[in-house]
Design a protein with these regions (language model features):
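Short amphipathic alpha-helical segments and helix-helix/interface helices
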Residues: 1, 28, 243-247
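Conserved helicase motor core of P-loop NTPases
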Residues: 2-8, 13-154, 159-162
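C-terminal accessory regions
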Residues: 63, 155, 168-300
Length: 300
């Protein structure tokens, strides 16, 4: 806003029930709560078809209660032990591909990187199953990751000069070997919807595999099929907004895998870490100074 000296009007569009920003603050929530600005709520949903059980599930999660009768055609819950989650997810992905979906249309989400149902384990398993080593496909190792041609790739940082941004997903189309380049170093070429971006070794840390990504990285995206594991060891990250964000990424079907009690407990938690800000008070009282408030509201 400081950079736009000639701004006459601002229109903010967002969903206060989804995850807040990674950085400090909770701007959209505070702007709405201040009741100082015109507010329009868009209630017609275009992502899913009318009557979709995905819509019903999302509404129920927002209310903190889910009707088990919704687990039918569009919404599925597969109860299984933590040790069986990986193989169950692999089976569902394989089944989806056999039904005609592409790997781009099937997205596995997980709230954490570690554990049996974590992003790292699931990425390795999905790559091994659906893009295994092949003499026809080149690959390069970077740390503990192996980047292989045809891999599903996630951009981790904004690169505006290349028109690729944090959370974008593409396909690794080509690995160039050192002997094929002038500087004798590897090069990776990733296709982001016809935008080809080249990565050299010093930039390999800006990408990772995208077979399984975090819910935070998925925000703003949409996929025909969403698959998400639920285990007790992820409880610290399972709360209503995260689960709502994950499930509402789906256009056609949601698969919830694992421990039903972890899912049910998660949707009961409104916030894991309440963000205490003063933006709402400043807007209401019309001052840039922190307004004295009840001690219980701001116990710091």
């Amino acid at each position: 806003m400081k950079a736009g000296a000639n701004i006459r009007k601002i229109c903010l569009i967002g969903d206060e029930d989804q995850l807040p920003s990674v950085g400090p603050g909770c701007v959209l929530r505070d702007l709405i709560a201040s009741e100082r600005f015109p507010l329009v709520r868009l209630n017609h949903i275009y992502r899913q078809k009318d009557g979709s059980e995905v819509i019903s599930l999302a509404h129920d999660i927002r209310r903190g209660m889910v009707d088990p009768s919704f687990y039918h055609q569009d919404v599925h819950f597969v109860s299984c032990a933590d040790t069986a989650i990986r193989d169950t997810i692999l089976h569902i992905v394989k089944q989806s591909l056999q039904m005609g979906y592409s790997m781009d249309e099937v997205q596995v989400l997980s709230p954490m990187y570690r554990g049996n149902a974590g992003i790292d384990v699931l990425n390795n398993a999905l790559q091994a199953s659906f893009n295994p080593p092949d003499t026809e496909k080149r690959e390069v190792q970077s740390g503990y990751r192996i980047f292989r041609e045809h891999d599903k790739i996630l951009q981790l940082k904004n690169q505006p000069d290349d028109d690729v941004y944090n959370g974008d997903i593409g396909i690794l189309e080509e690995v160039t070997l050192p002997e094929e380049t002038e500087d004798k170093r590897h090069a990776l070429f990733v296709n982001y919807q016809d935008n080809i971006v080249c990565y050299r070794p010093e930039n390999f840390d800006k990408i990772t595999h995208a077979y399984c990504i975090s819910v935070h990285k998925s925000q703003g995206g949409e996929y025909p099929i969403i698959i998400m594991p639920f285990i007790r060891s992820h409880s610290i990250m399972l709360y209503r907004k995260l689960i709502y964000t994950a499930c509402s990424r789906a256009r056609k079907a949601v698969w919830l895998i694992g421990d039903m009690s972890a899912f049910e407990a998660g949707i009961q938690v409104e916030e894991r870490h309440v963000r205490r800000t003063t933006l709402q008070q400043r807007l209401i009282y019309g001052t840039t100074e922190v307004v004295d408030t009840d001690e219980n509201d701001f116990p710091f």
